[in-house]
């Protein structure tokens, strides 16, 4: 959208530099200005619609991060690829409300899913007796949101995290 606006401004600048010989009444210039104004209004409407949907999606969980499943069952390596292609990342809840939002997805699907805890800051939600490296080097969350060591080869629910910085 911004590219279209910039293109319109470039056209406007071209008309201003070349003078008004080709458009003595200013019809083309007025048309370009009108189109730019319509595009700006459309961009603003789309931006507000996006914000409304984002706020609605995050309202119930209290988290600005969205956790979404495509209902597939995959191992950790496949999950990395899927989340990256979708524009998200492997879940990495860093606050209790984020972990709760993630756990809500798992509870709804009655499944477990991988997560990354390396950058979780001060928040952890390890189950009793965990982490246990003997179980594996990856981490999964159960349906209640408790974390467990697991094998990266396990096949778990695909859940990706999406975080919008506005």
Swiss-Prot record:
Disulfide bonds join 83-160, 138-152. One of its GO terms (molecular function) is phospholipase A2 inhibitor activity. Keywords: Calcium, Disulfide bond, Glycoprotein, Lectin, Phospholipase A2 inhibitor, Secreted, Signal. InterPro entries: C-type_lectin-like, C-type_lectin-like/link_sf, C-type_lectin_CS, CTDL_fold. Glycans are attached at residue 122. Residues 46-161 form the C-type lectin domain. Residues 1-19 form the signal peptide. The keyword Hydrolase does not apply. Expressed by the liver. One of its GO terms (cellular component) is extracellular region. Gene3D superfamilies: Mannose-Binding Protein A, subunit A. Its main location: secreted. It is found in: Secreted. Pfam families: Lectin_C. This phospholipase A2 inhibitor binds directly phospholipase A2 in the presence or absence of calcium. Homotrimer; non-covalently linked. This is Phospholipase A2 inhibitor A4/A5. It comes from Crotalus durissus terrificus (South American rattlesnake). The lineage of its organism: Eukaryota, Metazoa, Chordata, Craniata, Vertebrata.
